[in-house]
């Protein structure tokens, strides 16, 4: 019996998404990038990552914001743009939901841990 070729992984798309978090990423456009129908793409994405495209992207944006809060002195507005949230209100909303602290409080806690 001939082997069925495996479907290509979404890894190249995930790498591209992680490098382009500041860009909008509608499911329709992401699906088109990998030559899939949006519903097929959404199912495949969940199968490979365990979550929806929107939740995965938001998680990556929060990770980026955390790193910027820990490693830079950038303001929350600048971090929001760099992480792909667009504005500080969106950053605060998503960050607080996922981390359990505001960006300002997180930075303060992180900096307090580093102090001698």
Question: What are the residue ranges of the model-derived segments?
Answer:
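Short, Lys/Arg-enriched, Trp-marked, Pro/Gly-tolerant hinge/linker segments that flank
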Residues: 1-19, 28-34, 47-52, 59
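Terminal helix-turn-helix DNA-binding modules in bacterial transcription factors
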Residues: 24-28, 47-88, 108-116
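Residues within the alpha-helical elements of helix-turn-helix
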Residues: 33, 82-83, 98
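The short coil/loop that forms the "turn" connecting the two helices of the helix-turn-helix
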Residues: 36, 85-86, 101
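Key DNA-contact positions within bacterial/archaeal DNA-binding proteins
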Residues: 39, 88-89, 104
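Short hydrophobic/aromatic patch on the recognition helix
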Residues: 41, 45, 90-91, 95
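Nucleic acid-binding interface residues in structured DNA/RNA-binding domains
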Residues: 63, 75, 96, 101-102
């Amino acid at each position: 019996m001939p082997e069925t070729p495996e479907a290509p992984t979404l890894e190249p798309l995930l790498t591209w998404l992680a490098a382009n978090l500041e860009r909008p990423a509608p499911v329709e456009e992401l699906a088109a990038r990998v030559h899939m129908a949006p519903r097929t793409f959404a199912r495949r994405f969940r199968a490979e990552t365990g979550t929806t495209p929107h939740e995965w992207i938001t998680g990556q944006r929060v990770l980026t914001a955390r790193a910027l809060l820990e490693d830079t002195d950038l303001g929350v507005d600048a971090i929001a743009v760099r992480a792909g949230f667009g504005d500080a209100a969106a950053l605060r909303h998503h960050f607080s939901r996922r981390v359990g602290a505001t960006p300002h409080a997180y930075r303060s806690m992180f900096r307090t841990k580093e102090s001698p």
